[in-house]
Amino acid sequence: MNRKTKDLILIYICFALFAAGLIIWGITLKSCKDQMIQPQEVVQEQQAEVPVVYDRPMANPAAQVEAVQQLPEFPSGDEFAAAASFLNAYGYDAMIEDLIPCMNYSEDNFIEAYIGDATTDTGYCFAGSLVICMNNYLVPQNTAIRTVNKSGISWEEFKNYINSGQPMIVWFTNDYNSPRFTDITYNNYFTMYENAHCVVVYGIENGIVAFADSLNENNSGKVGIPEDEFRQIWEACGSQCIGTYYINR
């Protein structure tokens, strides 16, 4: 092999090595770019999957109470309207229509169920029934809050609960007068009254009890009456009330 041939072979080898180097460099560069881009894509996917948590204890739900009006669709739906107003104060988006299917219904048991039809002029229940209804609404959503029947507590206990920033659903009267009892009873102990009405109490201050009334269209349904007057009517209605608690997870 002469020298010229050797030089040509050497040139070809150098050219091949150079070309191979370019190819390897290009592959390496692409790989580096892919590695730089990939984490950004992963981060974006992770951010999209992070849930937004709304269900957490609120500092002062009583301050969030707004009346939910029951008319004209639900003439006797004050219990459901009060429940919607109450739950909304805790950050939920409840409507009367959402709660009606969650209620138990009965022809005579207004302690654990609802008698009648909220879309008519005849329909009523007591605190235990509404607690069941609201928890039937809350449990399937895996919420942290549950409602509890606190009927029978003293007035001081009631005031302390309200003053802690927690609202309460109470059984009152629709005309703000004493209850007018009927002959409708359950277990020969519980007696229904014809002017029964549910409201949501959210404040007691300077001798005035403030509550949201689903039948009052003035002042966005917010009403205030003297504490001694409210207490007398509430106790005559059986001191019925509903509060809440947060479950441990």
Tell what function each PLM region has.
Residues 1-6:
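Positively charged n-region of N-terminal signal peptides that target proteins for export
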Residues 7-129, 174-176, 181-184, 189-192, ...:
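Active-site-adjacent structural segments surrounding the nucleophilic cysteine of cysteine proteases
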Residues 37, 178, 182-193, 202-249:
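Noncatalytic regulatory segments and standalone regulatory/sensor domains
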Residues 83-95, 104-108, 135-143, 163, ...:
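Sec-exported extracytoplasmic/periplasmic mature domains
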Residues 94, 125, 153, 221-225:
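Short coil/turn linker and secondary-structure boundary residues
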Residues 117-198, 202-205, 241-244:
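Predominantly the structural core of cysteine protease catalytic domains
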